[in-house]
Design a protein with these regions (language model features):
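Active-site-adjacent structural segments surrounding the nucleophilic cysteine of cysteine proteases
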Residues: 1-79, 131
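Conserved active-site-adjacent core of cysteine acyl-enzyme catalytic domains
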Residues: 57-180
Length: 180
């Protein structure tokens, strides 16, 4: 069966590829995707932010990114640390934005509903897969509501699965909120 791809309707953030080196290893896909998403939401607010790679380094520290014992020293961060680290950065900058997320096991229906709502609202989404096949965070350009909830990455069109049979999957986004 051919996937029914639903493409993001608006302009997407800066691509989250070509990770910079930070503290002796790659900055990590979690921090890099968060930096691209934050810059996308801060620009219309007129908020000056560091360049993508510098911001990714700040976010990697806030998200508690840790090096994996592999060549090139890739980094990883847990989904709850990704979310709390980005929200700490948003709070520290007094931005009227909050990061949100949903992740877990076999969440095909709830994640499809979130993607439908977020894409319809023109809100860019970061996908998350932690499975035997892939361990990655990345900005999404499309998704297909099917088994394992496949999604296309904005950076290069490759795929990830947001509801893998074995492992965790999820989505993250930023919303505008009213500050007191």
């Amino acid at each position: 069966m051919t996937p029914d791809w639903r493409t993001f309707p608006g302009p997407l953030p800066q691509r989250d590829g070509n990770q910079a080196v930070w503290r002796g290893g790659l900055v990590g896909c979690g921090a890099l995707s968060a930096a691209c998403l934050l810059r996308h939401h801060a620009a219309p607010l007129g908020v000056p932010l560091p360049d993508r790679d510098t911001l990714a380094g700040h976010l990697a520290a806030a998200q508690g990114a840790f090096r994996l014992p592999l060549p090139q020293g890739p980094r990883a961060t847990w989904p709850w640390a990704w979310l709390s680290g980005l929200n700490t950065s948003l709070n520290d900058r007094n931005l009227p934005l909050r990061a949100r997320g949903r992740w877990g096991f076999h969440l095909h229906a709830p994640l499809t509903a979130h993607l439908d709502r977020l894409f319809s609202a023109g809100l860019p989404v970061i996908g998350f897969e932690f499975s035997t096949r892939e361990q990655h965070y990345g900005l999404l350009s499309a998704y297909s509501p099917g088994p394992e909830l496949p999604a296309r990455l904005h950076v290069d069109g490759s795929s990830m699965h947001l509801a893998p049979r074995i492992g965790l999957g999820g989505v993250f986004w930023i919303e505008t909120v009213s500050l007191p």
